[in-house]
Amino acid sequence: CTGRLVTPSFGCGHHHIYSALARGMPPAPKAPANFLEVLEYVWWRMDKKLDHDMIEASALVTGLYCAKNGVTFVIDHHASPFHLDGSLETIAKALDRVGLGHLLCYEISCRDGEEIKEKGLDETDAFLSSGRKGHVGLHASFTVDDDLLGRAVDLARKHKTGVHIHVAEGIEDQEHCARTYGKSVVRRLSDAGVLDLPLSILGHCVHLDAEERDLIRTSPCWVVQNTESNLNNNVGLGRYNDFPRVMLGTDGMHSDMIRSAQSSYFIAGLAEGGMSPLAAYQRLRAVHAHIQGHNAPGGGANNLVILNYDSPTPLTQDNFPGHFCYAFDARNVESVISQGRLIVDHGRLAGMDEADILAYANEQARRLWALL
């Protein structure tokens, strides 16, 4: 490692592995006019077609890209309502093969009826009962009724974990909650006990009022920021600088946490009144504390990334965050160690054939696209 930088590897606080085969897929039958239509015409249309092989290919190719980007741990939020049974174990085994740590969940909701809702609860209980680590996943307040919300919190308590849910990503979530329950999204989640669980993850948190911010600020739960996805979906920019526990995620847009950290840094001037490079780097690193809270495999000190970075200016411990925010990218990732095992060696995945993974992903993408 002479002349190289060695740092802890990266973790993704919120991913959607199931979207990996969406790159370049056929357009929606109608151009979405708002966030709800993005869900209805794009993602909900796609996730209903996923089967075991598509899910496996999605996990393998996501694992490949994570590893090559220096990401050795993934917190994922999965959806495949008509191929639900065993889906979490399929993802777990694929990520294990690549060598990544993970905390998985299935995003249970009421959008596909009672039978699918019950299957989501059963899948979650079975996965967590098997000894795997993860969360109890929910889609969002506007697709989760009171029965499901209460049972999800009970299930999380049973397994000593948290609830992983999208929160006020679009303003529609708040409008539905006010109309249906007479309260804000975060107040509803707080009343149900979600915010009492230290391992709960609230994704996005874009449209919050002052009371909701106070509820989150005084709770032990986590918030995850997904800047690029929020920009892509035109839902707005969240403000996160007053929350004590904030992680960074990609929301399935990609698997590059260097890029996510830089995006959060560059957008902070608009959303948060500015942020220092050190603060952006610390936000990137916050995920490690969440992982350690689960005692999950892959959260230890034997997870490292070796960076090949030739700087034209002096590089010191003090100015490292500035170099990171302005100059680093995934091309600097040379080798990666995950749980003490070399999984990327000089830019190539170790122990698996990259070409085979990509060919499998292409095959499954064609199958998926033919169904859309």
Predicted regions, residues:
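Histidine-rich, glycine-flanked metal-binding segment
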Residues: 1-7
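A conserved active-site cap/scaffold subdomain adjacent to cofactor or substrate pockets
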Residues: 203, 207-244, 249
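Active-site gating loops and adjacent loop-to-helix segments of metal-dependent hydrolytic enzymes
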Residues: 21-55, 113, 167, 171-197, ...
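Alpha-helical scaffold segments that flank or form the walls of functional sites
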Residues: 6, 25-78, 82-100, 122-129, ...
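Histidine-centered catalytic micro-motifs
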Residues: 8-20, 162-171
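Metal-coordinating catalytic core of metallo-dependent amide/deamination hydrolases
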Residues: 83-206
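His/Asp/Glu-enriched, well-ordered alpha-helical/loop segment
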Residues: 191-197, 239-309, 327-328
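Active-site microenvironment of metallo-dependent hydrolases
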Residues: 281-372
